[in-house]
């Protein structure tokens, strides 16, 4: 599955206003659509990540960043053949309760 290393946030530092996490998504990874209650900034370090935002697909590449506003239907995936390494910054901090996944069958 996806590697998640939270540096700042509810688990790492009990911070509720902001979370910062380093992530590595393996080839073929995806998660269910979600409608989060937080803004999420993604900063790509290497590889590519596919993001579906309200039905439109965007591919984020190394060195690029993207903001997805809270309340927007979004799905993150890595359908590519290489790992996707990135940083995720959520405001307020990420929580399993506030991500609102449509079908939480993945971890």
Where are these regions (language model features)?
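Short acidic-glycine-tyrosine-enriched beta hairpin
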Residues: 55-70
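Histidine-centered metal-chelating micro-motifs
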Residues: 30-31, 50, 66, 70-76
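Ligand-binding loop in jelly-roll beta-barrel domains
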Residues: 14, 70-96
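Structural motif
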Residues: 48-50, 57, 73, 83
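A short, N-terminal "cap"/entry segment at the start of jelly-roll beta-barrel domains
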Residues: 1-17, 24, 32, 98-107
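Short, conserved beta-strand element in jelly-roll/cupin
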Residues: 22-26, 34-51, 89-91
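Short glycine/proline-enriched turns and hinge-like loops at secondary-structure junctions
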Residues: 17-18, 35-36, 79-80
